[in-house]
Swiss-Prot record:
Annotated S-S bridges: none
Lineage per the UniProt record: Eukaryota, Rhodophyta, Bangiophyceae, Bangiales, Bangiaceae
Protein name: Photosystem II reaction center protein J
Cellular-component GO terms for this entry: chloroplast thylakoid membrane; photosystem II reaction center
One Gene Ontology biological process: photosynthesis
Superkingdom of origin organism: Eukaryota
Keyword Chaperone annotated: no
Stored Pfam families: PsbJ (PF01788)
Biological source species: Porphyra purpurea (Red seaweed)
NCBIfam families found in the cross-reference section: PRK02565.1
Function description: One of the components of the core complex of photosystem II (PSII). PSII is a light-driven water:plastoquinone oxidoreductase that uses light energy to abstract electrons from H(2)O, generating O(2) and a proton gradient subsequently used for ATP formation. It consists of a core antenna complex that captures photons, and an electron transfer chain that converts photonic excitation into a charge separation.
Gene3D superfamilies: 6.10.250.2070
HAMAP family (alphabetical): PSII_PsbJ (MF_01305)
Keywords of this entry: Chloroplast, Membrane, Photosynthesis, Photosystem II, Plastid, Reaction center, Thylakoid, Transmembrane, Transmembrane helix
Length: 39
């Protein structure tokens, strides 16, 4: 954890957060639409 990585921590957190929100949104939308079982 020297902080000399090529990828900034904020960038990892941003991409990870967006991916998590996207997956969660798709899961909720699929369950709400009734097509969650097809996933």
């Amino acid at each position: 954890m020297a902080g000399t990585g090529r990828i900034p921590l904020w960038l990892v957190a941003t991409v990870g957060g967006m991916a998590a929100i996207t997956v969660l949104g798709i899961f909720i939308y699929g369950s709400y639409s009734g097509v969650g079982s097809s996933l």
